[in-house]
UniProtKB/Swiss-Prot annotation:
F-type ATPases have 2 components, CF(1) - the catalytic core - and CF(0) - the membrane proton channel. CF(1) has five subunits: alpha(3), beta(3), gamma(1), delta(1), epsilon(1). CF(0) has three main subunits: a(1), b(2) and c(9-12). The alpha and beta chains form an alternating ring which encloses part of the gamma chain. CF(1) is attached to CF(0) by a central stalk formed by the gamma and epsilon chains, while a peripheral stalk is formed by the delta and b chains. It comes from Salmonella gallinarum (strain 287/91 / NCTC 13346). Its EC number is 7.1.2.2. InterPro entries: AAA+_ATPase (IPR003593), ATP-synt_VA_C (IPR055190), ATP_synth_F1_bsu (IPR005722), ATPase_a/bsu_AS (IPR020003), ATPase_alpha/beta_chains (IPR050053), ATPase_F1/V1/A1_a/bsu_N (IPR004100), ATPase_F1/V1/A1_a/bsu_N_sf (IPR036121), ATPase_F1/V1/A1_a/bsu_nucl-bd (IPR000194). PROSITE patterns: ATPASE_ALPHA_BETA. This is ATP synthase subunit beta. GO terms for molecular function: ATP binding; ATP hydrolysis activity; proton-transporting ATP synthase activity, rotational mechanism. It catalyses: ATP + H2O + 4 H(+)(in) = ADP + phosphate + 5 H(+)(out). HAMAP family: ATP_synth_beta_bact.
Amino acid sequence: MATGKIVQVIGAVVDVEFPQDAVPRVYDALEVQNGNEKLVLEVQQQLGGGIVRTIAMGSSDGLSRGLDVKDLEHPIEVPVGKATLGRIMNVLGEPVDMKGEIGEEERWAIHRAAPSYEELSNSQELLETGIKVIDLMCPFAKGGKVGLFGGAGVGKTVNMMELIRNIAIEHSGYSVFAGVGERTREGNDFYHEMTDSNVIDKVSLVYGQMNEPPGNRLRVALTGLTMAEKFRDEGRDVLLFVDNIYRYTLAGTEVSALLGRMPSAVGYQPTLAEEMGVLQERITSTKTGSITSVQAVYVPADDLTDPSPATTFAHLDATVVLSRQIASLGIYPAVDPLDSTSRQLDPLVVGQEHYDTARGVQSILQRYQELKDIIAILGMDELSEEDKLVVARARKIQRFLSQPFFVAEVFTGSPGKYVSLKDTIRGFKGIMEGEYDHLPEQAFYMVGSIDEAVEKAKKL
């Protein structure tokens, strides 16, 4: 085991000099004793002359030149398997929940090759989420990849937590949650939410929050993914939740700048597409088991053409776009039914009735968008009878796309609702065919199934 010495410290970047014949490989882990703490460094570049440039996985406060550094001769390794369930770990797989050692039987390196082309499997099975707008407009595939896109404060994390609650409770498999550069408060809320709903013993939690150095935030997604891969390779169907993939990109940008690389478009790292690919290509289903992943994607300044969200789009099977305009109408979940897409929305996969209902809803909402200008200038009275009907139905559909969430009960005071796909299709089909033209539009706001809307109308 070779030993080197620190020669330079610039923030999270630490340069270490080793003997010329024992230079560590790129991505090898190094260990340095920093006071009472052990600090792990990851080799990023070999600068020549026996010097390697590394990124610190923790705070570099207190490091000084001349400290001894050990080469561990392998990449960062984290615990995998059932021992990780119900535990909160950091990027190195160390427990941070004060419940003692993990007691794992096996450790895996966080840098792994993606499955080969022959190993991949294709699934057409749908995953019901119980959220009307998602099940109807952008259905999820079991073993697929989903992105929740949205700007600041439109409800990415709340939607993610509702999905976890619905899928983890209805689906009895294991889940892995990777908190990448998000708020510690949300991580804490999430842990208690899982504990209260008795699913904590089926979830592994890996956190690298906002206050961590960039090296930590860049690698924590890989730590969570490695744990999910282990469950998948045991032949299970596992859920992987990543909140937030944008912070992974941002950490990459910070590391890239610290390493002295030239920035590319909008200041992102030149290796943006490759870094995203390395992560996303591993999140996949094989013939032994599946990983269904849900990733929250922050959209800077609500601009979907920003390089970071734009690079993420290419890897996903379904995109759920959260819109500020819809949130400002008070409609939650604020999913934009015209902007959200799914590869599964195909009559051969979801069936003709589901497909026709979803496309019908989209065409009515699209027509309503077009008529809005006329209404704003001339008023409703100038519309033809046919268009008035379209507007009335569109407004009902828009309100019926809202739904009370279980995880938001504490804020809204109304109990959460889980709506089956069958009820969702029946409800929207009924509105489109005019069965509920006699009901007031308020009746459709914040209800579960269409039967609840009918009940609510009686009270109005």
